[in-house]
Amino acid sequence: MSQLDLGTQSLELERFPPQENSNTLQAWEAADEYLLQNIDLSKIDGRPVLVFNDQFGTLACALHAYRPFSSSDSYMSQLATAHNLRLNHLDESAVTLLSSVDDLPEAPKLVVIKIPKALALLEHQLRALRRVVAPDTVIIAGAKSRDVHNSTLQLFEKILGPTKTTLAWKKARLIHCEVADIPLADAPETIDWPLPNTDYIIHNHANVFSRNNLDIGARFFMEILPYDVTGKIADLGCGNGVVGLIALEQNPLAEMLFVDESYMAVASSELNITVNRPQDLSRCEFMVSHGLAGVERESLQLVLCNPPFHQQHAVSDHVAWQMFCDAKRCLKAGGELMIVGNRHLDYFHKLKRLFGNCETLDSNQKFMVLKSVKQASSRSEGGGSGSLDMSYSDF
């Protein structure tokens, strides 16, 4: 937990999900502080205030009195925003949470943008803004100085209008943009490409990992996916759904659950099944979720996972660990977790300690495909459908 002192208010902020090492990673950064110092609140006239990419809810908490709309592609960020509003005893209903695929409010007076990691997502958001902004909309964006590039500024100028940047402060930089009536060519909603060795065409929304081509880890994983599984299979952290798409083809008697914390990932997965295997839609479920929260314990026969090893810019295996714990809770006895991961991450020993077993199915110079089986004698993981309450140090 960390404290942000803004002069007129002080906020206690925590990263989400809470981690044992959370004291070493604060839930806000200098760009948040710089933005809040440079917003002229006297100009807010009752029209909507719109915030983008507020990772842990810092901006939403600071601006809660103005009833902001907060747009994010991350379900985890939405959970973090709600968590920090509660932590500061602020009214959760004062902040309207929007997903990246939701419509934006018309004619906002103030737009505050944290520059996202993916330039494609920023372009999508700026194009969506262009459709709703008014001539007097105030637009201010911020990020670490290293993340504000000429290409970033050019994107604002091309889509919205004249743009300038500030001097750096605490290694952060701001962008000020004015709305102008400038011509802009249309752009497709998705990037499409053929999936190698298949007749499938893959469609990716802006914030999908490896948007422009097949992820090399997924490519390796897909080569050894199982056949003829019955029961329910989960593609956990599904991204664009290519792993689940192949699993759906190879397991005609199974049901498929596609789950990710990214709204655009789940939308891409659903689109890819709709376009490529419409006959199998009735066997599919698509869920935006924090891991497998909301999935009943002991309901899955197989979990397929290509876990991330970072949360935004911070390198961490906490998200992967939560996925593994969720998989153990949700698998039936005899059910299997199959993952692909970089060799250097040492998932083998982590899975062996968690499940009591782990097998290497295949490996190359960069990746390993591992399998763990849930034993009938596994200790109780608790009831209900929430995430497994288990810390890394327990194993």
UniProtKB/Swiss-Prot annotation:
GO terms for molecular function: 23S rRNA (guanine(1835)-N(2))-methyltransferase activity; nucleic acid binding. Keywords: Cytoplasm, Methyltransferase, rRNA processing, S-adenosyl-L-methionine, Transferase. GO terms for cellular component: cytoplasm. It is found in: Cytoplasm. It catalyses: guanosine(1835) in 23S rRNA + S-adenosyl-L-methionine = N(2)-methylguanosine(1835) in 23S rRNA + S-adenosyl-L-homocysteine + H(+). Its EC number is 2.1.1.174. Its main location: cytoplasm. SUPFAM superfamilies: S-adenosyl-L-methionine-dependent methyltransferases. InterPro entries: DNA_methylase_N6_adenine_CS, rRNA_m2G-MeTrfase_RlmG, RsmC/RlmG, SAM-dependent_MTases_sf, Small_mtfrase_dom. Specifically methylates the guanine in position 1835 (m2G1835) of 23S rRNA. Belongs to the methyltransferase superfamily. RlmG family. NCBIfam families: PRK15001.1 (NF011577). This is Ribosomal RNA large subunit methyltransferase G. It comes from Yersinia pestis (strain Pestoides F). The gene is rlmG.
